């Protein structure tokens, strides 16, 4: 029915494109007029358009003129002009939607149109990329356009200073990675002086490779950690124990669910080894947690796939890009467990100081849009979570790539032999081949096999990331075989026959030209600078030379069939497979793609089912014979759909939990901002005192009908324990009191006490003390609360056994814990400020110093902490803070 509807009325995307057709006409209609403008007249358009906005016009009103200005600037500065399809994509981005644009269609240039338009409002535009290289490259490349038109540009990459960050965020256009934007937001909400904040409000963001950032990485929270206090000895001891355990007998391993646990026998062995009666006992929670993480490190985390060992450190490999993630650590003790497994020095476990998911960070933007070559398969998720729909942008030229049927083999060895034979044949006729593997281990295994056959190849994986751009840019040259992990090199165009611009720049770099001079030498705008003119001549001469070389090579490669893509196994997501295929056939070039699959591949083994294997066994095929059966293709797609559905469920589940923390985070961070910006917090502190008084009075008068029956002695003792001297409380004419007059009487006494304290200390110093103490109390309590909520979340899953919705239970109990934290913040703040001594030296300092920014582990397992009975005063606090009840929520 859907297909019939689309045949008659066109697809949803085609209908959306028709709606913006006339707007694109208006942009192109200005082309001739803007060509005639001088550089100065074109540059003055920026001030003119800003003026129209200040007079009340909307961004939509000035869109045609803004787009036409940027199109002409792009031609003058870069020698590039936006195609009509890029105008379509740009309008979609401006509308806060996702433009699905195929590889090589010019997403980077397309984005300059909505970026320029939205930057005119003066509130900042963020262009988000997946790695530092692309952020730096795009900023230098496209930044020339914005600067030509009088806008400022900044870039946020790992390792720059606070001052550089602030300057970059204050620019009209800011390029950066998703990680840096997210971590800067968290760091801004940990500063102790407002001047140390770097970000502005989240206004408008365009997310490049939006599927990678908002879908693939959505399960993994960003975490800023401080140094923990726990000893690291237990990690080594537990690792030695776990090493002795046997799969099935002692350990239950479920690769499909990515989980590993002790069996009953394994639990008995653990109890015997560590001399305890019951591993599940709450007192053994820490040991149980260490064992779980050691099991995961030993059985689920694989060297050269999930991580590499470099210079005595564990470096995480990004699961989606295959890149090394320097400076990132697994949280929750998993990193330490891997260090123990590999026999490295163990660094202390960290304490979470601040955390947020990408989902909740990017949902803070007033307007959010994205671009990618593959998003349509995930449109339901984009709609459900981000309220963004996906519009497919037509290609500038028809795609002629030949996507061949999968080659399915019984075993992995047969598969590798077959694809090596395929590569050998293509190498001999000069056809370039890009091979996509899913791990470093597989890429190096294949490279070794090819070298044995005398086939030279370039290997691009996390171990060789420094040459990434160079390797990918030349992957379209004659007879070049490139092996790349997953989607490494994404964002760099593969041009058939080689990239003359890249070759010219590389030659200039060899000759000693500075990067900035090379970047300016590639532009076309007018200049009087003699050094730049000379560099431009050198660049143009080199460009002509390399164009001649690559032109003939381009023809040879096209004759050989264009770029051929080989996938060494199917990814969990169809979208990732499509991304790999999309590297070939750019801008109407010929090309082809083929996936080689074995029934031993993880996806097939875990989700393909035994049914497929039994069919193959009956066919009696040899290992190196390809299997062709309609059912196999359907099974592969069904396996991928199963995994995609499961992963969507996990991401949705993560978001349901993080939404609870997100509301709490907004309250705390909002409170911090008020404290940092406020001149005086006196009223705020007195209001806290009023809240304490009102609640205390309500409790100590609750069970009595008459004022004479109120527990005023208990009330006095309670308030004296917080901030008020017992002698200052006296009540006359008790029988005439009401709850309200009692509250007011105590508040007036409190106000006088605070005035006296202020007089004793001096008003100016009191204002600074208020800020220092409120910030320190908020930060201390919030960090403890993050830990407590994490403990609650790990244990809440058990509620499902009792027919209780775990998410609902988490919301209710999390709300109770948050209220307890707010009360605790109020009590501690009032206690410290009412009792501060004049000679006390109190300085503004961070409660805990961040030592690292890391990605959480999306599949963490932790021993459960379940709130059961009412705690005694000396019992551990049920909130999970680790303190005694009387020193925590029972204060």
Curated annotation (Swiss-Prot):
It catalyses: ATP + H2O + cellular proteinSide 1 = ADP + phosphate + cellular proteinSide 2. May bind 1 zinc ion per subunit. Zn(2+) binds at residues 877, 879, 888-889. It is an enzyme of class 7 (translocase). Residues 845-891 are annotated as: Disordered. Monomer and homodimer. Part of the essential Sec protein translocation apparatus which comprises SecA, SecYEG and auxiliary proteins SecDF. Other proteins may also be involved. It is a peripheral membrane protein. ATP binds at residues 86, 104-108, 493. Part of the Sec protein translocase complex. Interacts with the SecYEG preprotein conducting channel. Has a central role in coupling the hydrolysis of ATP to the transfer of proteins into and across the cell membrane, serving as an ATP-driven molecular motor driving the stepwise translocation of polypeptide chains across the membrane. CDD domains: DEXDc_SecA, SF2_C_secA. Keywords: ATP-binding, Cell membrane, Cytoplasm, Membrane, Metal-binding, Nucleotide-binding, Protein transport, Translocase, Translocation, Transport, Zinc. Belongs to the SecA family. This is Protein translocase subunit SecA 1. InterPro entries: Helicase_ATP-bd (IPR014001), P-loop_NTPase (IPR027417), SEC_C_motif (IPR004027), SecA (IPR000185), SecA_CS (IPR020937), SecA_DEAD (IPR011115), SecA_motor_DEAD (IPR014018), SecA_preprotein_X-link_dom (IPR011130). Pfam families: P-loop_SecA (PF21090), SEC-C (PF02810), SecA_DEAD (PF07517), SecA_PP_bind (PF01043), SecA_SW (PF07516). PANTHER family: CHLOROPLAST PROTEIN-TRANSPORTING ATPASE, SECA INNER MEMBRANE COMPONENT OF SEC PROTEIN SECRETION SYSTEM.
